[in-house]
Each structure stands twice: as C-alpha cells, then as structure tokens.
C-alpha cells in the first residue's frame, strides 16, 4: 500500500516546479502566499464581514447550481430515467387501491431510515462544522426509550404515536422483565441507520485525498496539508497529538482493513485522518467504506447504545438524583428540577399529562431545547461561512491563473 501511487508522487514533484516568467517559483514564497490567502479566507465570516460573506455565499450557491445543471444536462438519459421512475412512484402513491397499505408501510420505513441516516451524515460530513446529532437526537431518543422501558416494564410501545411520542402500553410486563438486550433491540434500527449516515459522511475526506494523490495537485484543505506536513516531519514529532495522529496513520497504512475497522469502531476525533490516509495511499473504496460501515454502524453503535442504556437505567438515574441531593447547601435546590422532570415524564408515559397539577415548563427541558436551537444555528452559520470562503478561494485561484498567463 505504501508503494501505491509512486508515479503520482513523481508527478507531484514535477508539478511543484512551476515556471513563472521564465524562473522557477521559490517554494517558500509559494507557501507564504498560500498562508496569506488562507488567512484572508478565514476572515470571511458573518461576524467580521457580514455583507461580503452573504454575497459570496449567494454567489457560491449560484456557481454550484450552474455546475450541477451542466452535469445533469450532459446526463440527460439518467435524468429522464429518474423522472420516469419518479412519475411511476408518484402515481403509485396517489392512486387508490389495495396496494395502499403496503405503500403506507414502505413510506413509514423510508422516512424513518432517511431521517436517521440524514442525521448521521450531518454529524460527520463536516459542512463547516459537524452537527453533533448523537448528543442532540439519537442519545436522548435512546435515553427516553430506556426510561420508558423501566417505567412501563415493556418496550411494546403503541405505534403510533411511537417513535414520535412514547406512551406505556395498556398491558405492561411484570417488574424486572426488562433486559439490556430488549432495549438494545428496540433502538437497533435508529442506531444502525444513524451509524450508516456517519459512515457516508466520512467519504468526502477519502475522495478528496484520493483525487489529490491521483492528480498530483495539492488541494487547499487544512486537514490534508496538516497530514502531508505530518508525513514530512514524522521522525521529529514530539507532542502527544502528533504522535497519536501518526499512530492512526501507521495503523491504517500497515494493517489495512482491520486497522480502519479499529479506528471506526472506537469513538475518537481522529477518524478524518484515517479517511485522508486511505485516500492518500489509494486504499480501495470498498475496503475503506466496508470497514468504516461495519465499525460505525455495528460495533461503535452498540458501544454507544450500551453506554447510554446503562447510564439511564432506573437504578443509576435514581442514584444520580440522590447524589445531586446530597451536595451540601445547594443539593436540594438542584435536585428538585430533576425530580420534577422525571415525574413529568412518568405522567406522560401513563397518559396523565393533562391531569393533576398544571404542567409548567421544566428548566431542564427549556435549557435543552435552547441548546438544540443554538447548535443548529451555529451549524447553519458555519455552512454559510464555509461556502463563502469556498467562493473566495475560487476568486484567488482565478487571480493566480491570470498572473501566470501574463
């Protein structure tokens, strides 16, 4: 694998010897110019240059739409086939008949799968910055199912309203019948679909590094440039972060499939480096994606599921609430909102939300809702900034090419 793409390295060396006005370009001046351009782009953010950022964001959208329109125009047969298939599906969906029961069942499953796969992609695709959808969506869903399972002594929640809302079935099980495996089985589809989405979201770094290696070009991607610098200074790396990155790179490069599987299975912030490494050393696509899919959708998801289920099991939650109440001085005041929140959840599970005391908004749920709103807004802002910086990069590349032709 290490020898893969040897010709690509030679081609890159040749391309680095660019000639400008009859003289070879000084590598240090080229690197300095790239650094200045990168700093200029990093300053194009909404809180520093709002008008320019919004202008570049709009222009980048227009450029992307133009590129996709051109691509679709050159693939008219595929577009026509897709439109015909879409017309058949729409007709099947709206025409009355005995098939509607199957259509509704397929629609329900499709929307469920698409929802969780989409959240998984958003979590790792890195559009500006990843949206932490496990903490915001999947983790709370698993926690809610866990708390409900112990309260209802069953996981056979009525559908509908499950999964949108969880209520106890009319006939619950006996105390102590809920097992760890039954809860794992209940949330398996949601967790696996989310894991598949995260695996799909890891593909951009792989394709970027692979395309750069095959073409010999050097993409202006910070993570990829950091990866190349790390390879150049591998022997002099001293700090822990650099050694950890080198360990991941060597594991993936030498072990291959099982190295990628190990990196994907263990929650770690360095997996993007594994994708870049696989692309750079031209690891076959199915070797990379297969190991990533198995690691993230099966092994890692079961680790995360078990952790959340154990953390939110009935006796652990009761112990945590009791521990909060034991804090000297402020314990009882901190314990009260947790107790109110848990009691409100129990009432909802047993159809008692409209009965008894008026339902005031608990500050825990209020804070979590606001946290979700803030993180989603930050995610949207990061996308706007990232796309605006992409357009600024287009301008810089055009100016550089004009300078070379003079």
UniProtKB/Swiss-Prot annotation:
Domain notes: The VTT domain was previously called the SNARE-assoc domain. As there is no evidence that this domain associates with SNARE proteins, it was renamed as VMP1, TMEM41, and TVP38 (VTT) domain.
Cellular localisation: Endoplasmic reticulum-Golgi intermediate compartment membrane; Cell membrane; Vacuole membrane; Endoplasmic reticulum membrane
Stretches the record annotates as VTT domain: 173-316
SUBUNIT field: Interacts with BECN1. Interacts with TJP1. Interacts with TP53INP2. Interacts with TMEM41B. Interacts with ATP2A2, PLN and SLN; competes with PLN and SLN to prevent them from forming an inhibitory complex with ATP2A2. Interacts with ATG2A.
Location (main, coarse): endoplasmic reticulum
Keyword entries, A-Z: Acetylation, Autophagy, Cell adhesion, Cell membrane, Endoplasmic reticulum, Lipid transport, Membrane, Transmembrane, Transmembrane helix, Transport, Vacuole
Highest taxon, organism lineage: Eukaryota
Catalytic activity line of the entry: a 1,2-diacyl-sn-glycero-3-phospho-L-serine(in) = a 1,2-diacyl-sn-glycero-3-phospho-L-serine(out); cholesterol(in) = cholesterol(out); a 1,2-diacyl-sn-glycero-3-phosphocholine(in) = a 1,2-diacyl-sn-glycero-3-phosphocholine(out); a 1,2-diacyl-sn-glycero-3-phosphoethanolamine(in) = a 1,2-diacyl-sn-glycero-3-phosphoethanolamine(out)
Start-end of Basic and acidic residues biased regions: 1-20
Residues with N-acetylalanine modification: 2
GO MF annotation terms: phospholipid scramblase activity
Biased composition (Polar residues): 21-30
Assigned GO CC terms: autophagosome membrane; endoplasmic reticulum; endoplasmic reticulum membrane; endoplasmic reticulum-Golgi intermediate compartment membrane; nucleolus; phagophore assembly site; plasma membrane
Residue ranges crossing the lipid bilayer per the database entry: 44-64, 78-98, 110-130, 251-271, 274-294, 306-326, 364-384
Gene Ontology BP terms: autophagosome assembly; autophagosome membrane docking; autophagy; cell junction assembly; cell-cell adhesion; embryo implantation; lipoprotein transport; mitochondrion-endoplasmic reticulum membrane tethering
Extracellular compartment segments: 65-77, 131-250, 295-305, 385-406
Organism: Pongo abelii (Sumatran orangutan)
Protein name per UniProt: Vacuole membrane protein 1
